[in-house]
C-alpha cells in the first residue's frame, strides 16, 4: 500500500512540477487569440467553458483504456505501477499537451496535418489514411459491445440489432451536429460518473488497506502466461500511460479553447487524471487477482465484481454505465475526428451541413460495412482488432517524433520528447516482432530487431539535427 500511495502522490506532483516545466518549454501565449475565437463556425470551432472542455477531453481520451488496460496490465506486477506513473508524467501527458497546443497554433489542424508539417509530405499522406482507418475501426468496434450489454438489460424485443441501430444513429448525430449540442452536454455527466467510480474505488482501497505489492519486493514479472514485461505491458497499458489515439482527439478540444493558458490543465491535466484512474484500477485489480487468482481474463467481469463488492448496488450501476458509456463516447468522437481529418486534407469547410454529409456518408458506409463484417466473422475481425493496440502506440511514435522536430526548429528543449520517442520506437518495433499477431519471433531476435530499429532512428535524428543549425525557421 505504501508504494501505491507514493506513486499516486508522485503522479499528482508530476502535474504541478514537470507539467509546469513542459508548459514553460512550449511557452503558451495568453494574449494570442485561439482558433475558437478567430475561426468560430458554430459547428466545430465553438468557445466552451474550460471545465467542460476538460471533462470532454478526459472522456475522449479515457474510454475503457485506463480501466481494462490497467486491469490486464496489473498481471505484470509492480512494474505496471511504475509504467503508469512514469509513462503518464514523462510521455503521455507531454505527448497530449504538445500535440494539442500545436493544433491550436496551427488553426485547429487535425493530427495528420500537424505530423506532415514536421515529418514531410509522404508521412502526412500515410498518416491521413492511417488515422482515418483507425478512427473508423474504433467507431465500428464500439457499437456492437455496448449494444450487446444494453440488450441484456432491456426487454427481449430490444435485441442486439435494435441497440446497434440506436447506438449508430447516436454516432451519426454526434458526428454531424455542433460540438456543443450533444458532446458538450452529455460528456461532462459521463465523465463525472467515471471519476466518481474511480474515487469510490480509491476510498475503499484506503479504507480496507489491502496488501498490495511493494517496490521493495522487486519488479518481478507475475504474469500467469509468462508474457514479457517489455514490450507487452507497455502496449497493454496504453491509455493509462501514453496513447496515440489521444493526439487524434486533442484537436477537437483545441478548436474550443478560449486561451492558450488553459492548455496544461486541459491536455496535461486530463492525461494525469486518466493516469490516476488507471493506477487506482491497477491496484484494485491486484487485490482481485490476489483473492481469485489470475485465470480471469475478462476485464468486464473483473470490473463488475470489484464495483459490486466494494461499492454495492450503486457501484454496480456505475460499472454498467461506465462499461456502456465509455466505449460509446470513444466511438462517436472517433468518427467525428475522421470527419475533421478528411475535411482538413480535402479543404472542405464544415459550417454547411451539406459539406459535412459529403464526408460523413462514405465514413458511415465504411463503418457499417466493418460492423457487418465483425458480426459475420467474429474471429477474423478479432484478428484485425488485435493490431489496434500496436497501431495506437505506433501513432504515438509518429506524434512524438513530429513534436521533437518542432522543438528542435523552435530551439527549445527537445529532449522532453526525444527520449519518449526513442523509447516508444523500441516498444513498437519489438512488439510487432514478438507478439503472436505480429511476426511471433523469439524474444532474443525481437529484442535485437527492436534495438536496431531504435538505433537507426537515433542515428537518423542525429544526422538530421546536424543539418539544422544553418536553417532559420519562423516562429509559430
Segments (PLM) and residue ranges:
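Helix-loop-helix module between adjacent transmembrane segments
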Residues: 11, 15, 91-107, 111-176, ...
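Hydrophobic alpha-helical segments and their helix-loop junctions in multi-pass secondary transporters
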Residues: 139-165, 174-175, 194-221, 406-414, ...
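Hydrophobic, membrane-embedded alpha-helices of multi-pass small-molecule transporters
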Residues: 49-65, 202-210, 218-281, 321-330
Amino acid at each position: 500500500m505504501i508504494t501505491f500511495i507514493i506513486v499516486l502522490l508522485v503522479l499528482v506532483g508530476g502535474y504541478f512540477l514537470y507539467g509546469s516545466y513542459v508548459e514553460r518549454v512550449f511557452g503558451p501565449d495568453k494574449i494570442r487569440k485561439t482558433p475558437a475565437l478567430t475561426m468560430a463556425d458554430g459547428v466545430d470551432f465553438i468557445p466552451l467553458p474550460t471545465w467542460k472542455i476538460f471533462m470532454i477531453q478526459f472522456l475522449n481520451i479515457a474510454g475503457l483504456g485506463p480501466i481494462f488496460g490497467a486491469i490486464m496490465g496489473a498481471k505484470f506486477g509492480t512494474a505496471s505501477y511504475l509504467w503508469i506513473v512514469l509513462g503518464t508524467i514523462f510521455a503521455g501527458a507531454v505527448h497530449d499537451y504538445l500535440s494539442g497546443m500545436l493544433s491550436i497554433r496551427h488553426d485547429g489542424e487535425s493530427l495528420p496535418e500537424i505530423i506532415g508539417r514536421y515529418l514531410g509530405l509522404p508521412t502526412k499522406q500515410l498518416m491521413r489514411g492511417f488515422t482515418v482507418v483507425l478512427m473508423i475501426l474504433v467507431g465500428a468496434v464500439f457499437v456492437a459491445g455496448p449494444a450487446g450489454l444494453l440488450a441484456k438489460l432491456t426487454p427481449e424485443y430490444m435485441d442486439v440489432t435494435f441497440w446497434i441501430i440506436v447506438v449508430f444513429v447516436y454516432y451519426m448525430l454526434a458526428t454531424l451536429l455542433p460540438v456543443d449540442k450533444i458532446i458538450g452536454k452529455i460528456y461532462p455527466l459521463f465523465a463525472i460518473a467515471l471519476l466518481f467510480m474511480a474515487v469510490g474505488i480509491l476510498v475503499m482501497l484506503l479504507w480496507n488497506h489491502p496488501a498490495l505489492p511493494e517496490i521493495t519486493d522487486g519488479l518481478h514479472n507475475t504474469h500467469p502466461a509468462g508474457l514479457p514485461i517489455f514490450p507487452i505491458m507497455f502496449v497493454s497499458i496504453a491509455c493509462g500511460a501514453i496513447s496515440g489515439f489521444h493526439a487524434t482527439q486533442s484537436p477537437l478540444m483545441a478548436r474550443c479553447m478560449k486561451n492558450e493558458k488553459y492548455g496544461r490543465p486541459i491536455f496535461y491535466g486530463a492525461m494525469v487524471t486518466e493516469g490516476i484512474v488507471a493506477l487506482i484500477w491497477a491496484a484494485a485489480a491486484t487485490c482481485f487477482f490476489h483473492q481469485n487468482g489470475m485465470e480471469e481474463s475478462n476485464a468486464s467481469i473483473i470490473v463488475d465484481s470489484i464495483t459490486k463488492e466494494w461499492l454495492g448496488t450503486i457501484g454496480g450501476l456505475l460499472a454498467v454505465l461506465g462499461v456502456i458509456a465509455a466505449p460509446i463516447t470513444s466511438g462517436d468522437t472517433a468518427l467525428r475526428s475522421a470527419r475533421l481529418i478528411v475535411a482538413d486534407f480535402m479543404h472542405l469547410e464544415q459550417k454547411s451541413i451539406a459539406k459535412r454529409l459529403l464526408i460523413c456518408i462514405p465514413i458511415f458506409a465504411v463503418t457499417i460495412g466493418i460492423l457487418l463484417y465483425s458480426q459475420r466473422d467474429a474471429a477474423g475481425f478479432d484478428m484485425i482488432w488485435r493490431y489496434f493496440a500496436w497501431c495506437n502506440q505506433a501513432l504515438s511514435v509518429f506524434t512524438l517524433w513530429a513534436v521533437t522536430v518542432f522543438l528542435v526548429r523552435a530551439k527549445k528543449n527537445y529532449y522532453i520528447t526525444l527520449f519518449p520517442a526513442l523509447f516508444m520506437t523500441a516498444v513498437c518495433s519489438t512488439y510487432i516482432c514478438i507478439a503472436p499477431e505480429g511476426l511471433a519471433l523469439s524474444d532474443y531476435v525481437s529484442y535485437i530487431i527492436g534495438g536496431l530499429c531504435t538505433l537507426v532512428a537515433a542515428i537518423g535524428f542525429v544526422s538530421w539535427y546536424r543539418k539544422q543549425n544553418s536553417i532559420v525557421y519562423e516562429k509559430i
